[in-house]
Amino acid sequence: MMSKYVTTTKGLSHFMLFLLRLLALALFIYSVSLVFTSNFNMGNLLVWLLTAAVDVYAIWQQPIHHWLHGTIPGKIVFVFLLVFGILYAALLGFVAFSGYANPATGQEKVVIVLGAGLRKDRPSLLLRYRLDKAYEYAVAHPDALVITTGGQGRDEWVPEGQAMRNYLIEKGLDSQRVLAECKSTSTEENFLFAKEILVQQGISAQEPVVYVTNAFHCYRGGVYAAMAGFTTAHALPAGIPLRSVLTCYLREAAAVIYYWLFKSSRTGFMQPLVGLLSLNKKFFYK
């Protein structure tokens, strides 16, 4: 048995093993930091699961390597993980590049800013990236109306839409130009309820609009805008903090899969689970 272990571990050089353990340590430190720097969400959960898998493999590499390559069940699992990893990586690439596939034209007179979570009553760093991008557009287009969207999460002191509106006004936008939507709990509802506000303002959903979100989120933003009835919606992608790249892209890829399966964030197997666990819906697909 020992000879098998010695033989199978030769496939993983000392240098590669060092890199694996370095990656495991980095993921562990990053995972711990999320507890103190981010609200609990699906992205964090996926990172923790990834960290657990990498750390377990780094610690028990010998027996796991032997099982994956030396047994039939292990080989089946290995092939499954390999195919899954390749497909998920391809999906991550799709999410990354789709953010720039439908850019704003500069002719849009309505700006819809999608919510992204608060820290108490202030926009999170990720959300500030969106708001700053929306502010730049609003300053360059003084006749554009801005709608901030987002309801109040379980760990938030005020509705996102209100906190976002306050942020833009503090930066210098005229309060008459900024309207807050404060009921939505998902990207889909952001657009549905923003449309209601526009109708109240006498603006048709046929008018060109630009929605502001981070680049990774633009694909779903576009499809949900179309589902809500916006016929000409363009994306204005904002940047993303380096510390949020892994959590956001892992979560968004899962959210895209969910959309492809169920189309609507108001249906599907997640919906009763959300109610059962008393979790804000943004945990799964904000």
Model-identified regions with their sequence ranges:
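A structural signal for short, hydrophobic/glycine-enriched beta-strand patches
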Residues: 78, 90-250
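Extended hydrophobic blocks
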Residues: 1-108, 199-286
